[in-house]
């Protein structure tokens, strides 16, 4: 396995994901993790991430210096390379000007660049620069702007690269990372089949004959977890709370798919309860609080009536764990708890089999477990459901309008082969009414916003460049089939500054 030491780079998670794509298990630790903690994980190699700081800052994050004499293979990326060079006696200088964007390696040599020929495009993002390698080290790559773009240790077990091999803008970056894994002798058995085998063993050993309670939303994480519990043969109850805020046909689709695959599923019809609690509420934060409160009440009632349960299973993913732990260069984002706010008298032990997995790895497991593509490849859907896509007060009438429009948009994306090319797509019903023409008469109808984004990690996202012909057909079909909607607009805002959801 490979440990990635995090010094605050926006790409740290991407490094870990890229390694797993190469079938090498990886974990992220804080950059200043002591040697004892590092060795506890028995890594076969270490990667020092980039970071936003300068190695000249007095309070810049630094690794335990004992790591450099540990004998472990090392790869320093950007800031990580500068730390490596500075610690081992090389020279790092404040660059005359920052180097950001695409660059070309005009020279590269050695096993780290095996299989690469000619000039190689890479992505730079640094201010300081290594101007001389440590004693005995060699310069193994350069660009026109940077004569020290990569360095190698005398024994060939440690390297530094000034660029970012993990990003898409370094097209041959995966080859460079793979070369490093081979040089380090890293075991590469992190396959979906191996992961599934390990998770089944873990769940069976942990749960034993005790009962497990799970809340399912119809999303890929909780649905896959329900299938895992069923395949493991543990005594479980999966609870699907229908809060009346679902998309068109969603309850029937989720219920049918999970029951067919052997999940012990209980569906709770709580539509009236939720809509009554939301009556007259327009503030988005208040809506979220009410929905959370009502969900907890419905879930708690099931737990008491059908209990006792020893474990509460959650589809917590590795990014949730990372965000909860915090790290260098970023404040702690949140304390993660998927089913937060449960009463204290409901005493559960948490069972989180996916706590070390990324979303794409869960999708791979879902494929092995037989989850239908309609659920496996489904776009993310917020816990509060359509309540945060109906701006203003949530009513059954407005929900029904949005359901029909959203279904048309999603169906069209599938028809055009675009659904799997965007990371998330949604329709938002605004409280704005716009004047239009129906026949010979003026008519006021709702303004509907369509949104689609592309992203790798949902931390940042770009608006999807859908064909104008597609958007034209979507607007025509929606206004024709949903007469309550008089105007359709398309959201061209990226994240940041906007969030993906409107509320």
Curated annotation (Swiss-Prot):
The EC number(s) this enzyme carries: 6.3.5.2
Binding site for ATP: 217-223
Residues of the GMPS ATP-PPase domain: 190-378
GO molecular function, one term: GMP synthase activity
Active-site positions on this chain: 78 (nucleophile), 164, 166
Catalytic activity: XMP + L-glutamine + ATP + H2O = GMP + L-glutamate + AMP + diphosphate + 2 H(+)
Pathway recorded for this protein: Purine metabolism; GMP biosynthesis; GMP from XMP (L-Gln route): step 1/1
GO cellular component assignments: cytosol
UniProt domain Glutamine amidotransferase type-1: residue ranges: 1-189
Enzyme class: ligase
Keyword list, A-Z: ATP-binding, Glutamine amidotransferase, GMP biosynthesis, Ligase, Nucleotide-binding, Purine biosynthesis
Keyword Signal: no
Function (record text): Catalyzes the synthesis of GMP from XMP.
Subunit description: Homodimer.
NCBIfam families: guaA_Cterm, guaA_Nterm, PRK00074.1
Record-given protein name: GMP synthase [glutamine-hydrolyzing]
Organism: Thermus thermophilus (strain ATCC 27634 / DSM 579 / HB8)
Lineage, opening ranks: Bacteria, Thermotogati, Deinococcota, Deinococci, Thermales
């Amino acid at each position: 396995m490979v440990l990635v030491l995090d010094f605050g780079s926006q790409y740290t998670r991407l490094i870990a994901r890229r390694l797993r794509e190469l079938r090498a298990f990886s974990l992220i630790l804080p950059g200043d993790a002591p040697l004892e903690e590092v060795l506890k994980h028995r890594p076969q190699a270490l990667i020092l991430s980039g970071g936003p700081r300068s190695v000249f800052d007095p309070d810049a994050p630094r690794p335990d210096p004992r790591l450099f004499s540990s004998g472990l293979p090392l790869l320093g990326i950007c800031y990580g390379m500068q730390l490596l060079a500075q610690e081992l006696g090389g020279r790092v200088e404040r660059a005359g000007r920052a180097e950001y964007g695409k660059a070309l390696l005009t020279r590269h040599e050695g096993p780290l660049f095996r299989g690469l020929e000619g000039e190689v495009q890479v992505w730079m993002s640094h201010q300081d620069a290594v101007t001389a390698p440590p004693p005995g080290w060699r310069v193994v790559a350069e660009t026109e702007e940077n004569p020290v773009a990569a360095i190698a240790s005398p024994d060939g077990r440690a390297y530094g690269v000034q660029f970012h091999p993990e990003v898409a803008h370094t097209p041959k970056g995966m080859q460079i990372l793979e070369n490093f894994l081979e040089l380090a002798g890293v075991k590469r058995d992190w396959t979906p089949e191996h992961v599934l085998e390990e998770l089944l063993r873990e769940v069976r050993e942990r749960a034993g004959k005790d009962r497990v309670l799970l809340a399912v939303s119809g999303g890929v994480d909780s649905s896959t977890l329900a299938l895992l519990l069923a395949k493991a043969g543990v005594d479980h109850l999966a609870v699907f709370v229908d809060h009346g805020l679902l998309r068109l046909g969603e309850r029937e689709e989720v219920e049918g798919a999970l029951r067919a695959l052997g999940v012990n599923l209980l569906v709770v019809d709580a539509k009236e309860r939720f809509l009554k609690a939301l009556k007259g509420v327009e503030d988005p934060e208040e809506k979220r609080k009410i929905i959370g409160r009502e969900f907890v009440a419905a879930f708690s009632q099931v737990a008491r009536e059908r209990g006792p349960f020893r474990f509460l299973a959650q589809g917590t993913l590795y990014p949730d764990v990372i965000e909860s732990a915090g790290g260098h260069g970023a404040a702690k984002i949140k304390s993660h708890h998927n089913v937060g706010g449960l009463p204290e008298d409901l005493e559960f032990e948490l069972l989180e089999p996916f706590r070390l997995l990324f979303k794409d790895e869960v999708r791979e497991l879902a494929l092995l477990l037989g989850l239908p593509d309609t659920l496996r490849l489904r776009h993310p859907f917020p816990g509060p459901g359509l309540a945060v896509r109906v701006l203003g007060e949530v009513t059954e009438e407005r929900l029904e309008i949005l359901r029909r429009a959203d279904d048309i948009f999603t169906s069209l994306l599938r028809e055009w082969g675009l659904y799997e090319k965007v990371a998330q797509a949604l329709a938002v019903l605004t409280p704005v009414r716009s004047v239009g023409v129906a026949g010979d008469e003026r008519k006021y109808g709702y303004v509907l916003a369509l949104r689609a984004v592309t992203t790798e990690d949902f931390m940042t996202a770009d608006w999807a460049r859908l064909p104008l012909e597609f958007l034209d057909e979507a607007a025509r079909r929606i206004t024709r089939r949903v007469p309550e909607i008089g105007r359709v607009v398309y959201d061209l805002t990226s994240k940041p500054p906007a969030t993906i959801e409107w509320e």
